[in-house]
Amino acid sequence: MGFLDVARGLFRKKHADDDMPCSIVMLLRSPFAMSEEILKAAASKAFGVPYDGSNAMYFVGWHPRLKTVKAGPYLISVLEAEEPYLGDPAEVAQGFKNKRLEEAWIEHRTWVAFDLMNGEVPKKQAYTVLAKLAAELLDTRCAGIYLPRENQFTIQSDGSAEMHLRKMKG
């Protein structure tokens, strides 16, 4: 290996997903307005443990803009935004080859992201944990789910997103 090869290696950009957490983004047609009680109930159902303060490894941290869910060894951040994900939906959807995906993306007005903050968790396991929580909060407002790290979008109008989450849960 020559000097130029070493130099290229030092200054080469990391792959996009090297530092990106595993994430599931629910694209919503209308705001969720999630309450602490709703998030605790969803986490309790997802992980089979009461979120009532009785177990220090299972709790919900609450702030109006950022919520966290501690599920045993896992830490999940839950971020809500009352704006389209990645900017103007029509502009983002222009590159879609599938018309149904394009229409679903354009429909969304707001989003909720579930990010696993534990970087050392294997990808399949990370998505399993996230899918358990996201599946409990999925409802008719959801236009689809997006996995940024995988650049994968699944629509919900035909139940595909729900089925995708179910498969990820294992």
Where are these regions (language model features)?
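Glycine-rich, often proline-containing surface loops adjacent to acidic residues and nearby aromatics
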Residues: 21, 104-120
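Structural alpha-beta junctions
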Residues: 44-55, 132-146
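Short acidic, S/G/P-rich loop/turn micro-motifs used as interaction or catalytic elements
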Residues: 32-34, 118-122
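N-terminal alpha-helical "arm" segments
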Residues: 2-43
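Aromatic/basic-lined ligand-recognition segments
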Residues: 101-102, 149-170
